[in-house]
């Protein structure tokens, strides 16, 4: 889990566009965040396996 202060800081608008960065909405993780879902890869995988993300299915070929 991310520190509460860092999560609060990321929610504030950045002064400059280059300072903006994405964080996971669920856990606050700053790395490997999918912009479309606003989730990190760990949380995305958990929710996808539970079937809580509509339209996401496990790949099979």
From Swiss-Prot:
Positions of Zn(2+) binding: 24, 27, 40, 43
This protein's name: Small ribosomal subunit protein uS14
Sequence similarity: Belongs to the universal ribosomal protein uS14 family. Zinc-binding uS14 subfamily.
Example GO biological process: translation
Annotated cofactor note: Binds 1 zinc ion per subunit.
Residue ranges crossing the lipid bilayer per the database entry: none
Annotated organism of origin: Streptococcus mutans serotype c (strain ATCC 700610 / UA159)
Any single Gene Ontology cellular-component annotation: small ribosomal subunit
């Amino acid at each position: 889990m991310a520190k509460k202060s860092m999560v609060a800081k990321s929610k504030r608008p950045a002064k400059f566009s280059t300072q903006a960065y994405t964080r996971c909405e669920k856990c606050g993780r700053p790395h490997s965040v999918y912009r479309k879902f606003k989730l990190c890869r760990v949380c995305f995988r958990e929710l996808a396996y539970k079937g809580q993300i509509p339209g996401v299915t496990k790949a099979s070929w």
